[in-house]
Amino acid sequence: DFIDNLNRARVGDASCLDYFNAHSRSSRAYLPKDTLVLCANNRIADSINRENVDALDAPKVEFTAAVTGMVNSGDKMAPERIVLCRGARVMSLVNSPQEGYVNGTQGTVTDASADAVTVKFDGADEKVRIERHRWEINKSEAVVEMDEEGRPVNRVKTAVVGTYTQIP
């Protein structure tokens, strides 16, 4: 039921609301440890993540995003500032099937250094070292070009206008 309703939410199908309202809690204080919490916005998710990391007794490492070119807030696939440490629960934001994880795979940080984190993903045998990921920000525009016979043809041109680099 949960996955079916989550998929409905992803495509904007409001029929999932009854399910989530019936299975929601008004206070996180009563949630079991390591519960996955669906959030209405990034601000709430960032707050929960910060609380969980702050509660861990391990040295913290801060990762600050690198931005080049034209990058809007909606283009940022990860927070500009991420603080992690050993024991932090994380979820991948990228696909790397050769490394054994995809977008949404959850795991636990086993080590964090200035340039990477090492994660033991749930259900995996090996730990994975994850470095910063570079997302390209593309801008597309419709253009009219002439074909070889001089007739106008509509095309879409896409260009990289910026990059956003952060731990995924």
Kindly give the residue locations of the regions a language model identified:
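Conserved helicase motor core of P-loop NTPases
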Residues: 1-99, 108-110
